[in-house]
Amino acid sequence: MAKLVLVRHGKSEWNKQNRFTGWVDVDLAPEGIEEAKKAGQKLKEAGFCFDICFSSYLKRAIKTGIIILEELDLLFIDHLKDWRFNERHYGALTGLNKDEVKAEVGEEKFLLYRRSYDVPPPPLSEDDKRHPRFDPHYKNFPVELLPNTESLKDNQIRAMAAFHERVAPLLVEGKDVLITAHGNTIRGMVKELDGISDEDIPKFEIATGIPRVYEFDEALHIKNVYNID
């Protein structure tokens, strides 16, 4: 039975500062490094041995993957990066303090931007230096691929496209796959995998550093789902 394990990266420096991070390549905080180590240790204790790891293009997810693989003594396996596993793009909210945004726009609009399924925050202008087209990570990407804002639904669509294209075929082959990514990215994936409604997904939380395990049969039907915490 093939296993898929989703892990949200450990706490980042901007998580600590309560800022909207999105595609900004913020590093892990010391606490986040420890969270990643503990995730790897828990997976080792539970007997996991992965065939391949995927991460986003962002260092907080990449480093989380590396730390987990090191704890499992699996640094030799393929560790592939796919931008479609990036965090949701927060548009004009990128880099702003969440409490300050809430005070400015009001709680109702703040929750709509932050937690709703299909409402994106205000977009970045194309000449805003926070736009991904100015980021060297994406210098070879067609500009039309790069978002200036995203809803959770947008995030889910691109992440699940990567899942169906790259991950699902490996699970069908019986491979065990680790994905280290981001809170909204994983929330969107869980929504589709678990069949969570648009109304219920805003209340669903993804904790940092807690592995979420899916067990699949040969037909890619989910047979079991659980967290290792």
From Swiss-Prot:
SUPFAM superfamilies on file: Phosphoglycerate mutase-like (SSF53254)
Active site: 9, 87
One BP annotation, GO: gluconeogenesis
Enzyme Commission identifier(s): 5.4.2.11
InterPro entries linked to this entry: His_Pase_superF_clade-1, His_PPase_superfam, Phosphogly_mut1
Record field: transmembrane: none
Role summary: Catalyzes the interconversion of 2-phosphoglycerate and 3-phosphoglycerate.
Family membership: Belongs to the phosphoglycerate mutase family. BPG-dependent PGAM subfamily.
Stated name of the protein: 2,3-bisphosphoglycerate-dependent phosphoglycerate mutase
Organism per entry: Nautilia profundicola (strain ATCC BAA-1463 / DSM 18972 / AmH)
